[in-house]
């Protein structure tokens, strides 16, 4: 439309945000006082600098620090010369001039914030160009463009610095400290405890970046098991937890949760058949639950890209540490017209990627086919079994005779631990699972 401004055209020819004097001040501060490097590296990486010469100088300062050397002007110049980079950065004279840019290292944090802010603005412009290019591409759907935008912004929000390699000797102290802490605590748990002790003993708790799949036939109690775990994690341990309920409304989930926490029959709650004493138990349970960091998302037929977007937002805003998804078969794949097995594969791969991206465990429920009467389910029975078996770090199955309370939780796959069977008791009246008494 004539007269309408074109933001893309307006940006052409503009120099990206930067502040060379602040960059020189950061580098000069480090040369004056090597302890300033710790302050700078908390927010900056080499790519945070606009000048290519400054990028290489900062990287050299980090390299010298890693080697245990104090990076003064002479040492830095010799290091750059040995790397054949001294001429590239402007020679020894330019390196020496960096200390002229700042009287002392006292204000390095201030200069670092300026450089960091300019780097963030350049990154935002880069993301904007990526999104704009995809938005103009008619072969890419709007939903995919939205997913790209959400992913890029999330990555930008959380990418404080670029990934770096570490020498083995630099990793050993952290490992030794972790081992010593575990020894002092005398605990087998290295992940998030589910509250089902026998299961936690087998798994060591649910680990960050893991995809855990719980499979069962219909009406075996998948949701009840997931809610048992989620309530143990969020209510008793106060660990921020997200529960994506694609099958059941949040009101029904809360009704189940109140029954499980109060010990009041779920059937009586649903029908209103309550005794006066029940109200006190319900109020006590509600009080325990009130401040629990349990976030319920009840969107039927939720799209995969929406699930990822909400999960990212919850992790940023609420610091979620574990996600439950009930259940895989109700997630709408990005390509709903693909064959169903391809959709399952895409969903499985996406959830595993999301677990790694967010660095938290994701627990996904799944229905299994009907095995022969009386036989326990196995990996081949789970829908999308090929993809799930490949992507999941842990796969477990609920198994029991339909009208029995004694339940087996079969740990059929554990990438980093043993397999086995956990004996549980299903308390149907309260829609909860507990470990079977020995």
Swiss-Prot record:
Q: What is this protein called?
A: Replicative DNA helicase DnaB
Q: Which residues form the SF4 helicase domain?
A: 185-438
Record family assignment: Belongs to the helicase family. DnaB subfamily.
A biological-process GO annotation: DNA replication, synthesis of primer
Residue ranges annotated as coiled coil are none
Q: Write down the chemical reaction(s) this protein catalyses.
A: Couples ATP hydrolysis with the unwinding of duplex DNA at the replication fork by translocating in the 5'-3' direction. This creates two antiparallel DNA single strands (ssDNA). The leading ssDNA polymer is the template for DNA polymerase III holoenzyme which synthesizes a continuous strand; ATP + H2O = ADP + phosphate + H(+)
Q: Name one GO cellular component term.
A: cytosol
The UniProt record lists the keyword Cell division: no
Q: Which Pfam families match?
A: DnaB (PF00772), DnaB_C (PF03796)
Q: Which purpose does this protein serve, as stated in its record?
A: The main replicative DNA helicase, it participates in initiation and elongation during chromosome replication. Travels ahead of the DNA replisome, separating dsDNA into templates for DNA synthesis. A processive ATP-dependent 5'-3' DNA helicase it has DNA-dependent ATPase activity.
- What Enzyme Commission number(s) does the record list for this chain? 5.6.2.3
């Amino acid at each position: 439309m004539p007269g309408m401004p074109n933001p893309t055209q307006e940006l052409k020819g503009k120099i990206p945000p930067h502040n060379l004097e602040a960059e020189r001040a950061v580098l000069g501060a480090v040369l004056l006082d090597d302890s300033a490097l710790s302050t700078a590296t908390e927010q900056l990486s080499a790519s945070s600098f606009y000048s290519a010469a400054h990028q290489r100088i900062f990287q050299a300062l980090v390299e010298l620090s890693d080697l245990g050397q104090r990076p003064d002007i002479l040492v830095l110049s010799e290091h750059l010369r040995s790397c054949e980079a001294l001429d590239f950065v402007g020679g020894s004279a330019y390196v020496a001039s960096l200390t002229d840019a700042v009287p002392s290292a006292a204000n390095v944090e201030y200069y670092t914030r300026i450089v960091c802010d300019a780097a963030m603005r350049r990154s935002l412009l880069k993301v904007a160009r990526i999104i704009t290019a995809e938005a103009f591409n008619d072969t890419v759907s709007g939903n995919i463009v939205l997913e790209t935008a959400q992913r890029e912004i999330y990555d930008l929000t959380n990418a404080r610095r670029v990934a770096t390699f570490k020498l083995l000797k630099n990793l050993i102290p952290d490992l030794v400290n972790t081992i010593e802490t575990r020894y002092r605590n005398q605990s087998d748990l290295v992940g998030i405890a589910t509250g089902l002790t026998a299961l936690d003993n087998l798994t060591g708790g649910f680990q960050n970046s893991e995809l855990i799949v719980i499979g069962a036939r219909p009406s075996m109690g998948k949701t009840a098991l997931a809610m048992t775990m989620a309530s143990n994690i969020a209510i008793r341990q106060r660990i921020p937890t997200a529960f994506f309920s694609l099958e059941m409304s949040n009101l029904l989930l809360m009704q189940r949760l109140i029954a499980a926490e109060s010990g009041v029959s779920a059937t009586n709650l649903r029908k209103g058949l309550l005794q006066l004493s029940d109200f006190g138990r319900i109020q006590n349970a509600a009080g325990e639950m009130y401040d629990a960091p349990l976030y319920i998302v009840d969107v039927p037929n939720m799209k995969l890209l929406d699930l990822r977007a909400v999960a990212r937002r919850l992790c940023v805003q609420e610091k979620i540490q574990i996600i439950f998804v009930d259940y895989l078969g109700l997630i709408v794949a990005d390509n709903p017209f693909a064959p169903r097995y391809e959709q399952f594969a895409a969903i499985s791969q996406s959830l595993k990627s999301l677990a790694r991206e967010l660095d938290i465990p994701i627990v996904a429920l799944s229905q299994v086919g009907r095995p022969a009467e009386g036989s326990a389910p196995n990996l081949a029975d789970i829908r999308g079994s090929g993809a799930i078996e490949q992507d999941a770090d842990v796969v477990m199955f609920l198994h029991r005779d339909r009208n029995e309370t004694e339940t087996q939780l079969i740990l059929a796959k554990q990438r980093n631990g043993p397999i086995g069977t956990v004996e549980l008791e299903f308390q149907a009246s309260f829609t909860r699972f507990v470990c079977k008494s020995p």
